[in-house]
Amino acid sequence: RTFRRKKDAEELSCGFEDSYKDVQRWAVDHNISVGIDFSIIARYNHNQENLGCRLSYEELEHIISEKIINDSEYIEDLKKEITENKRKTEDSYICSICNSSICIGPSGNVFPCVGWTNKVVGNIVNNSLYDIWIQSDEVKRLRTIRLKDFIECKECNFKEYCTICMVRNSNESPTGNPFELSRYFCNIAKIKKELHNKYCSNLKRK
């Protein structure tokens, strides 16, 4: 595939599997920041056809193992993720949704997250953003959600390697339930922990 750098473009998302390393090298050569995300979430309307493009667990294990061994930045980011997750308490927010961030669409619709566009909490044509932020019942409800509300996650052995995401849960749930866990991401956390522990054990033997 061919990329042309679009003027004023801030972000470009594109799917790759076999040649992602070539894309990374191309980006570095062209002084473009690039990140690798192997997590595909369902569409905001709960359509799951795109999930057929997800990597298998075997493919995930191969890529994560490769990055742990060869990518020092990935290891540093993983360490930061683990440290930050260890600091969290039961009363910690899940993420920035409706406590420090919110999104506005081109039609004026206001929604909690860029991936949650069907969950409209107001419209700036009808109300000010301030009023929506302060008065919206849905914003208030989302703001009350804490880690302790995800009962199963509290006792999970892989929680330090996982970041709970209400959007990916909601999009993948047929009923739009943000508390219905996406098991695919639970298994990603399991793979990350097992491979990281193996990496650390190998370092100690050297």
What do these predicted ranges mean?
Residues 1-97, 103-107, 115-124:
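Radical SAM enzyme [4Fe-4S]-AdoMet core and its adjacent flexible, acidic
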Residues 117-206:
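Flexible mid-to-C-terminal extensions adjoining Fe-S/redox cofactors in radical SAM and related proteins
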Residues 28-51, 102, 144, 183-205:
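Repeat-unit-sized solenoid/scaffold elements
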